[in-house]
Amino acid sequence: MLHSALSSIFANGIRKRRMNQINKSHRSLCGAKFLIGAVTLFLALAGTGCNDNLSHVGGSVMPPKDALYPHADTLHFDAHSVDIDSVYDRSTYSLLGELSDPLYGNLRASYISRFQYARDYHTEFEPIGGAIDSTFIEVSYAKWVGDSTVWSKVTAYEVKQKLPESRYSGDVQPYLKGASYLGALTYRAGNATGVHKLRIPVSKELGMRFYKASKEHPEYFASQEAFEENLLRGIYLHSTTGNGCMLSVYSTSLVLSYRYQKSDTTRTGADTTYIATAEESFVNTKQLYLHRQFETDRGDVLKKPNSDYAFITSPQGLALSLSVNADELSKTFLKQGSGNTRLINEAALTLAVDPPDVRGSVLQPATYLLLLPADSLGHFFEMGETERSQSNIAFLSSAYNITSRTYVFANISRLIQAHLTKHIHVNDKGVATLDEPLKLIALPVTRETMSGNRNVTATISNYIYPSGARIRLNNGQVRIGVVTTIYAKD
């Protein structure tokens, strides 16, 4: 009963056929997508009002019972900002530094990096005197936000507490108990394009610990667990001073530097020996858990109810909540009249961005937003989904347009229909009811594409980069134009 009733309310099979099939049987008609041309004529009317009946289509070429009636509706989504308590991410990217924005507030970022063990590790060459000369924490970055002329300071600590196996950002303070100071560096961000590196000098004792273990305890390099239990759990990098610049870090390494005697042959064939320098690195990888901490101070102010604006920020900032109540959904999609069936053809969502009205704002809108049901948020990132693998519920916006200042979701009709199909209940008399509101969330994401095909998404991740967008609202709402088609049932 439920399946047949839902099928009569939402026929989702009218797709991709031409108008020259219009005189075929009613069964063929239900399987065709000849409606596209007719529906397109009414797209402009979709956002202008509610329940606007349009002229019927096909009256002169079809039996009366088969006449098609395009219909324009507007769904009113209540919109406001909500906290993103933590963000899930599998990458090696993090942020380091402190940034102030007059609209979005202060943002500070620090992190704990773990390092991949090297099985059966030994130094490639024998260090002179059996000594590691220097040890560094190397922070590699290609981008930064803010003022590159600001002097900042980063301090490195060795973490002594066992770290959780979690890819969610959060408070790292509980894991800093007993942490020991290793070193610090004062720096300014590099202005030139390309890869930049910070080299934080740390205690040579850390490098010697690795060297001695390679000689005396090779079992410490047998597994990641043994490595962290006996040698190094992680390094905490903390932004201590300097406000105005934040680095986008893509790699963190522990570097051991030592001198060794190198034998070679000169151009004349004579043997020679000289002192050379070698460096060996332990790196963080995607297989390890990176523990990020993001601190902001204006989230409570920005998420207060506002009839004109809502805010979207990253990382671990604010997302846009969109919800439409069950009563409005029922009025729009269930009351199509006796003997009629309604098809959802088009549902276009555009989010308009207003530039900040304060001077000195440094945060820019993220390139992409992801729209999906609020209850699917955690599962989506944990399972590594994309808008292709979850095409019925997840929608990626077009790239942010700096000219029109908009994010566009071209057609989210499948998302609406998926909600209706899941939550409509049909009683014994065939009467359909709906009592579950549609709750969506839009948040900043990073999109990576397939090699050789920039049109195909490979991965979608939370946006680990400072961003901010002020979304324009209409009396606390966002309106979505919906075009449907009503046709007579057999």
Task: Please annotate each region the language model reported.
Residues L2-D490:
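Secreted, disulfide-rich extracellular signaling modules
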